Amino acid sequence: MKQTVLLLFTALFLSGCSVASADDSVPRFTEEGKYIGSADPHTIAVSLNGEETMIQVPKDKRDECESLPDQTHVLVKYTKKDNGTLQLEDIQLRKNS
């Protein structure tokens, strides 16, 4: 009986190990663009491929974004959620070219 319970528990435990998290299926992008500035405390505007794009900024990245000068070249890494919202993962200042 103990072996059966242990076997079932182990099978149940291991079945959860292969479940992909929601973040694994979210499309990720890395693009160069021009940082336009903050739209509000949690959104930045970046020109990507000549089009102004709004990207949501998580709390841990807000200070980093606020320190960027407007109209500077940046490399942005972001995800696109199912509802179309873009979420910033990283932003790096690039030399103007």
Swiss-Prot record:
Q: Where in the cell is it found?
A: Cell membrane
Annotated membrane topology is:
Lipid-anchor
Origin, by domain of life?
Bacteria
Record lineage: Bacteria, Bacillati, Bacillota, Bacilli, Bacillales
Q: What is this protein called?
A: Uncharacterized lipoprotein YqiH
Keywords (alphabetical) are: Cell membrane, Lipoprotein, Membrane, Palmitate, Signal
Question: Which residues are covalently lipidated (S-diacylglycerol cysteine)?
Answer: 17
Q: Which GO terms describe its cellular component?
A: plasma membrane
Annotated organism of origin: Bacillus subtilis (strain 168)
User: Entry's PROSITE patterns?
Assistant: PROKAR_LIPOPROTEIN
Signal peptide residues on this chain, from the entry's feature table: 1-16
Could you list the residues that carry lipid attachment of the N-palmitoyl cysteine kind.
17
